[in-house]
Design a protein with these regions (language model features):
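N-terminal Lys/Arg-rich, disordered targeting/topogenic segments
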Residues: 1-23
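Solvent-exposed loop/turn and edge beta-strand elements of beta-rich ligand-binding domains
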Residues: 17-31, 112-131, 145, 193, ...
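PPIase-associated folding chaperone regions across multiple families
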Residues: 18-29, 44-101, 219-292, 330-404, ...
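Hydrophobic membrane-insertion alpha-helices, especially the h-region
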Residues: 29-41
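N-terminal targeting/tethering segments
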Residues: 64-231
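Sec-exported extracytoplasmic/periplasmic mature domains
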Residues: 123-131, 174-193, 204-218, 242-259, ...
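Surface-exposed intrinsically disordered loops and tails
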Residues: 139-162, 323-325, 333-348, 443, ...
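Peptidyl-prolyl cis-trans isomerase
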Residues: 296-342, 404-447
Length: 545
């Protein structure tokens, strides 16, 4: 079973993720959390007269073998896999040609961005927004994102702004693109090298596209163009994957350098200003929509009645209150961001106890809230874990069989040896990780909730089943002085410092200039692919009815 509930935490402005591309042949994972979008408005420059020269044809010479898994060549003074160098060189020529044939949609510093490249980024932003809306519908029964799935971005106004969704998407494109290129350029200048696993991930994305194209009996370029638009080549698409991989690696390395630069006294000084900001609490939250029956709500006095009330009053028969109302461990700020400051204030009020229940007027609704675990300062914990990942296409019966098989192994240990040493043997023989140190957020929340419950004792064990997989956990103990707030504050300080650095470089060398005539053509071009995607959504919706 996969360990992480979410991907690596973002730094200040992490370069756009390279996963979840909506190209045929690439499986798109369900969005794990509702995406909150916050972007900066792009800065515009007076149009420059000088234009980039056609790229020179670079003959790629491989470097001498050094025993590495991959064959390398040089790209602008930096060692890269030869496949990457060839793709980047080809993409540079393709981009130049696309600018001449389809027009320059944007200029980012001294880079020209063609209409096809803009459409690629724009369509992906659109796609992620639709995933967010679909997730909202899945979790709450309603689309709370403000984005209409069946209207074009140019046809609908953003609910919190004075402009259309197309402008929102354009701002995101500019920010993502500028940051990707800026961090990539910095990475190349710094001589950053990717790990073998990162290189493999990029090459696998190309192989996925190739398999998808083969299944449709067309070329990779045709596959890419069908998803995005005419003029976008496979090399241009893959160049972005490479750019993002290096940008992300450099972002992570620079962030880590900042983190390592802070002393404990630096961190403690921040913590002492407001310790409550670094505590976490676990509660259930149910939005009371429609008619509010105060008498009915007042009869809810425990967790069982809370869940019964939520299941009874939710409009969807398939609603699972036990899963959906569970928040996991959240800080006051995070809770306030999701439900409103009133909910955060209630949860972290002095004297709050487990079992407390209230109706709180929050950001969007009245919320019925139930306190599971009052606020505390979490630490890392040592555990052993062995799990089974469920395939998303598994039937309920197959999942049941997988769980029963895993549970049988767990019970054989539990009812037999039952010791820590025995669990280690059981875990490692079943491809477990042995002993590991974990923090809140490292596992799916069902597992997280069990591990980090303050009542947990050394030697506790459990077999847990989740929507993603099942796993057996052995609790070794809590690391008393290894508080999460130490890590949180260091990462926050590093994020702020990295953000300042990024903004300084972006403002100096990557300011954006729009070509509005070409952008209008780009919107029309993107609409063709968006309409195709909307048709697929409609067909899927009909099938689910």
């Amino acid at each position: 079973m996969s360990k992480k509930k979410n991907t690596k935490k973002k730094t200040a402005k992490t370069p756009q993720a390279k996963t979840k591309r909506p190209v045929n042949g690439i499986i798109i994972a369900a969005v794990a959390v509702l995406i909150a979008v916050a972007v900066a408005v792009a800065v515009f420059l007076v149009k420059k007269n000088d234009k980039p020269e056609p790229p020179s044809v670079n003959h790629v010479e491989t470097l001498a073998p050094d025993g590495s898994k991959y064959t390398y060549a040089e790209y602008k003074g930096t060692k890269m896999p030869v496949e990457f160098v060839e793709i980047l060189n080809n993409a540079e020529q393709d981009s130049y040609d696309a600018c001449r044939e389809y027009g320059v949609a944007l200029e980012l510093g001294d880079r020209e961005i063609s209409l096809p490249e803009f459409v690629m980024y724009y369509y992906d932003v659109y796609y992620f927004q639709t995933e967010s809306a679909l997730y909202s519908i899945q979790q709450t029964g309603a689309n709370r994102t403000g984005y209409d799935l069946y209207k074009l971005p140019t046809e609908q106004k953003h609910p919190r702004e004075e402009y259309m969704w197309s402008e929102q998407f354009t701002q995101e494109v500019i920010e993502n693109m500028a940051l990707n290129y800026m961090m990539f350029d910095e990475a190349v200048e710094a001589g950053v090298e990717l790990s073998n696993s990162d290189i493999s991930a990029v090459l696998e994305s190309l192989q996925l596209i190739e398999r998808g194209a083969k299944s449709e009996q067309r070329t990779v370029d045709e596959e890419i163009a069908d998803t995005y638009c005419e003029g976008l080549t496979a090399d241009m698409y893959m160049a972005r994957e490479i750019v993002v991989a290096y940008a992300t690696a450099y972002d992570a390395a620079k962030h880590a350098d900042y983190v390592d630069s802070y002393s404990f006294s630096d961190v403690e000084a921040v913590f002492n200003k407001k310790p409550v900001d670094y505590a976490v609490a676990r509660l259930r939250v149910y939005p009371i929509e429609g008619e509010y029956n105060e008498a009915e709500v007042s009869e809810v006095s425990n967790e069982k009645e809370f869940l019964e009330y939520a299941n009874k009053n939710h409009p969807r028969d398939t609603y699972d209150a036990n899963f959906t109302t569970e928040c996991g461990y959240l800080t006051k700020q995070r809770l306030s961001d999701i439900y409103g400051t009133e909910v955060g204030e209630w949860a972290f009020a002095k004297g709050r106890k487990a079992g407390d229940i209230a109706v709180v007027q929050g950001m969007l609704f009245r919320y019925l809230v139930y306190m599971e675990v009052p606020a505390f300062h979490a630490t890392s914990c040592d555990i052993m874990f062995v799990g089974t990942q469920y395939d998303e296409n598994m039937t309920a019966e197959t999942r049941k069989q997988e769980f029963e098989k895993a549970e049988k192994m767990y019970l054989e240990w539990k009812n037999g040896d039952g010791t820590k040493e025995g669990f280690w043997d059981y875990s490692t023989s079943a491809n477990g990780m042995g002993e590991e140190t974990v923090r809140i957020g490292d596992y799916y929340f069902e597992i997280d909730n069990w591990i980090h419950d303050p009542s947990r004792k050394s030697g506790d064990s459990v077999m847990l089943n989740t929507s993603q997989g099942c796993g057996a956990v052995y609790y070794i103990g809590k690391n008393e002085d290894d508080f999460d707030w130490i890590k949180t504050i260091k990462e926050t300080l590093a994020t702020e410092e990295l953000k300042a650095y990024q903004q300084e470089v972006l403002a100096k060398d990557y300011e954006a200039e729009r070509n509005r005539a070409v952008l209008n053509n780009a919107y029309d071009t993107a609409d063709i692919s968006i309409l195709k995607h909307q048709k697929k959504l409609e067909e899927k919706e009909k099938q689910n009815k």
